[in-house]
Amino acid sequence: MAEPVDLDVAGPVGRPVLVVDFGAQYAQLIARRVREARVFSEVIPHTTSIEEIKARDPLALVLSGGPASVYAPGAPQLDPALFDLGLPVFGICYGFQVMAQALGGTVAHTGTSEYGRTELKVLGGDLHSDLPDIQPVWMSHGDAVTAAPDGFEVVASSAGAAVAAFENRERRLAGVQYHPEVMHTPHGQQILGRFLHDFAGIGARWTPANIANALIEQVRTQIGDGHAICGLSGGVDSAVAAALVQRAIGDRLTCVFVDHGLLRAGERAQVERDFVAATKANLVTVDVADTFLAALSGVTDPEGKRKIIGRQFIRAFEGAVRDVLDGRDIEFLVQGTLYPDVVESGGGSGTANIKSHHNVGGLPDDLKFALVEPLRLLFKDEVRAVGRELGLPEEIVARQPFPGPGLGIRIVGEVTGQRLDTLRRADSIAREELTAAGLDNQIWQCPVVLLADVRSVGVQGDNRTYGHPIVLRPVSSEDAMTADWTRVPFEVLERISTRITNEVPEVNRVVLDVTSKPPGTIEWE
């Protein structure tokens, strides 16, 4: 399989800030917060060598938190030689402690832990200047820095940490015991921005316009004089990816919409209408619903379904090249893979494989195309911003996420035509009611799930029913890395439930999924 080309950040966007991951659950969130300060960032494992870091030519380093104690056997360590590179460095929680230790400070298990909301007292310095002297922050630590390294000013304290923040302006080094990246630290983004812009002197160049220009140039360089084919799913990711490539190579891009029979109601017509109107791109629709359903027959394992869908998806493209595109030489396949897709599929160093994404881990080894993934390093909010920069309408860029495998992974059990019809009707009702209630912008997405192998007893009129349950999974999120269930008003839930059980005969029960991520993923499969 061709290796995807990562974003060349040495272009108009500039060099990256590297977030060194010490095992923190918030490492990806830190990267997002750095980007919100208009600075490009990437996450690297703490095992990355100093030579590798030098080769990346970063503008600064951010050391993440982590679950270990600096004194525990096998705990992640920091090579003091890192500070000889002369780079600005910002330590967070464990990163703050390991930074202090490497520079000659003292870290101890004081017996006073702080978890959750904590009051921070600002003692001076520049990191917290012009912010409240007493402010709430989010702490999560057992060990604490008890003595700052020589040359560092202690600039904040808390009840459980006499040294809750320190800084050395001359060396452009700073650190905090708390978590500035989480929403529970109200001034955290200002503090992180102050380090990036004031301490490190980094400009705010990670803007939608610069991102779009850099990605267009990247695609133009990768494809050269070649031709590309892009699969449209109806979602924002594939639409923005296609729009970028279309800007780069013009009519040498052909977009293919694979109607795999796993779509929601009205989806095909919407793609054929909205996307073509917005981009004027060449669009070919391939109807392969029967092929997909035959391949999925008898399959109930979620991973099996995802991989089959990924494999059939590519085969549909190869068929389009042969049958629809008149034998033209198509060398490149464009996909809307995002950074969270790569992370969940185990594409980041040290990450576990949570699930295969059909456009990451489900591709066949004998792939006939070289992959072009212009969005591979972007989060969803960045994709939407780039889409707006490219002039795509809100109907496309504001659309709630919908997985490439479609309704195939929203049926828990075997995928059949009848089950798809049942789920499609229930999904359409839920979407109609959420839109009518004005909740589209408050909900990240609302998967509607059919528990196809589960039945429960009900009663309608004077008759006993034995129907399937439908699960509503409304969630709120910023980037799909974490999510919380959305508190949809009860009256809206009631309308959805009443309509589904009245209008979809196979369903006699509607339930609400109130699980956050973690522990549950957004999609059930």
UniProtKB/Swiss-Prot annotation:
CDD domains cross-referenced by the UniProt entry: GATase1_GMP_Synthase, GMP_synthase_C
UniProt KW keywords: ATP-binding, Glutamine amidotransferase, GMP biosynthesis, Ligase, Nucleotide-binding, Purine biosynthesis
Domain GMPS ATP-PPase: 206-399
InterPro entries in the record: Class_I_gatase-like, GATASE, GMP_synth_C, GMP_synth_GATase, GMP_synthase, GMPS_ATP_PPase_dom, NAD/GMP_synthase, Rossmann-like_a/b/a_fold
EC numbers, comma separated: 6.3.5.2
Active site positions: 93 (nucleophile), 179, 181
Pathway(s) of this molecule: Purine metabolism; GMP biosynthesis; GMP from XMP (L-Gln route): step 1/1
Gene Ontology molecular functions: ATP binding; GMP synthase activity
The protein's assembly and partners: Homodimer.
Function: Catalyzes the synthesis of GMP from XMP.
Name the record gives this protein: GMP synthase [glutamine-hydrolyzing]
Organism: Mycobacterium marinum (strain ATCC BAA-535 / M)
Lineage: Bacteria, Bacillati, Actinomycetota, Actinomycetes, Mycobacteriales
